Amino acid sequence: MSSPHERPARFDVGIVGAGRVGAVLGAALTRAGHHVTGVSAVSEASRERAAMLLPGVPVKPIPEVVSGAHLVVLAIPDDVLAELIAGLATTGTFTAGQLVMHTSGAHGISVFESAIGSDLVPLALHPAMTFTGTDVDLERLQDCCFGVTTVDMARPLAEALVIEMGGDPVWIAEDERLTYHAALAHGANHLVTLVSQAMELLGHAGIEEPSRVLEPLLSAALANTLQQGDAALTGPVARGDVGTVAAHVALLREVAPDIRPTYLALARATAQRALLSGRLKAAAGDAMLQLLADEEDNS
C-alpha cells in the first residue's frame, strides 16, 4: 500500500463498529466521496443501522474490514480499543502506511503503542457530539467540533478528513486528551441526568409536559452560560436565598430522595463558583455553604 502522500484523495474505508458513531461517520465519509468497502456489525441493531446508513456495504469480520482499507475507522468502546489494536497488530492485519483512526474522546494516539511496528498512521478524531445513529446526525455534524490528535506529519490530513465530514477540527495535545473528554462528559452526559431529574420533579408538580416548561428556560440558560460563563448564574443559590434552598432540600427528602444528593452537590458547586466570581457576597456564601454541609451530613 502506498504512503498517504501518494494515495488518491479518495480512500477505501473500513468501519469497525456500526454503532451510533461508526455508521454515521461512515455515511459522512461516503457523502464526501470516499468508498466504504466493509463494516463490522455484531448485533442485530448494528446490522440494521449499517443497512440504513451504509446501504450496499458488506458486513465483514473485523480482519477483512481492516485489511482491505486505506483508512480504518475504529468506532468501538474505549475499554476495548487498546486490546483490539494490539490484536490486529499481533496478527499482522494492519498494513504499512495505513491510516487508522479511532473515535474515542478519552484516548489519544498512545493507545496505538502496541502497533508501533505496523508502520501505520495513527489518528484520534473525536466528534464532540451526541449521536442517535440516524441520518439526523449527518446534519448535526455540520460545524461540529472534532478533537484531533495525531503525529505532526499527519495533522493536515487529519484536519482535512474532519472538514470533509462537515466538522471543525480542534487540536488536542496528547497529554490533555483525558481532560478534554472529562469536560465534554461532564457538560453533556451529566446534563442529560440533570434535565431528566428536573423533568421528573415537574411531573411530581402535576405538569403534564415538563419539556414545554423547561425548553425556553434551559435554552436561555445554556446560551447565556456559553457567552458569559459564571456571570450567567441566577437563582436562589446565586442570590444567597438560604431559606428557599433549605425548603427545596426539605421537599426533596420527601418527594424525590434520589434527586436530593444531586441537588446538594450542584448547589454547593454553584455557591462556590458564585463566591469566586463575586456574584455572591462572603457572608451569604458562607451561610449557604454551611446549610448545604449540614444537609449533606444529615443525608
What is the predicted role of each segment?
Residues 223-283:
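Interdomain hinge/lid region at the active-site interface
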